[in-house]
Curated annotation (Swiss-Prot):
Domain comment in the entry: The N-terminal domain interacts with the head of the 30S subunit; the C-terminal domain interacts with the body and contacts protein S4. The interaction surface between S4 and S5 is involved in control of translational fidelity.
Family: Belongs to the universal ribosomal protein uS5 family.
Native source organism of the sequence: Phaeodactylum tricornutum (strain CCAP 1055/1)
Listed name of the protein: Small ribosomal subunit protein uS5c
Domain S5 DRBM: 26-89
Compartments it resides in: Plastid, Chloroplast
Primary localisation category: plastid
Primary gene name: rps5
Any one cellular-component term (Gene Ontology): chloroplast
Signal peptide (UniProt feature, chain positions): none
UniProt GO molecular function: rRNA binding; structural constituent of ribosome
InterPro entries, per the entry: Ribosomal_Su5_D2-typ_SF, Ribosomal_uS5, Ribosomal_uS5_bac-type, Ribosomal_uS5_C, Ribosomal_uS5_N, Ribosomal_uS5_N_CS, Ribsml_uS5_D2-typ_fold_subgr
Transmembrane helix as UniProt keyword: no
């Protein structure tokens, strides 16, 4: 009897381990690490700020920002922040976006247009990294305004949040 209970408990423990490891595999890409300083009464306190894009290359993406005393901890904290800010976006069969879209954040504006299969990601800077980590393979994007990497990454995430599918539009207009 007790050996049966031990086997059952062992199976339960193993099933918990397996379920924890079956989370979706997320890809992290570093946009920028910068050394920042805080001026205090005792002098300057140096720390590092990391900007990281996290995604599963299948329609989920998030941007994370964090500061820490060393680069490794800043990167880890930025990864966890990116996981908290994950959004989902619709991707077409051609691995593109469904329609034209624009997003703003601060003084940055990002315009995205769907592209034909095989054209690749035509974008620059942080917008390219966000689109690649999101899993979009064929798109044309242009960033206008400020060249700030963090704000451009956030503007591209805002643009991707504005994407809708035909089903969502039909439901919104009550065209069922």
């Amino acid at each position: 009897m007790s050996s049966d209970l031990k086997k059952i408990n062992k199976v339960k423990k193993n099933s918990r381990r397996i379920s924890n490891t079956q989370e979706p595999k997320l890809v992290e890409r570093l946009i920028k690490i910068s050394r920042v300083s805080k001026v205090t009464k005792g002098g300057k306190k140096l720390s590092f700020r990391a900007i990281v894009v996290v995604g599963d290359e299948n329609g989920k993406v998030g941007v994370g920002v964090a500061k820490a005393d060393d680069v490794v901890n800043a990167f880890k904290k930025a990864k966890t922040d990116g996981r908290k800010n994950l959004i989902e976006l619709p991707i077409t069969k051609a691995l593109s976006i469904p329609h034209n879209v624009a997003g703003n954040f601060g003084a940055c504006k990002v315009i995205m247009r769907p592209s034909i299969e095989g054209s690749g990601v035509i974008a620059g800077g942080a917008v390219r990294i966000v689109l690649e980590v999101a899993g979009v393979k064929n798109v044309i994007a242009k960033q206008l305004g400020s060249n700030n990497l963090l704000n451009n990454a956030r503007a591209s995430v805002c643009a991707l949040q504005n994407l809708t599918t035909k089903a969502q539009v039909a439901k919104k207009r009550n065209l069922d």
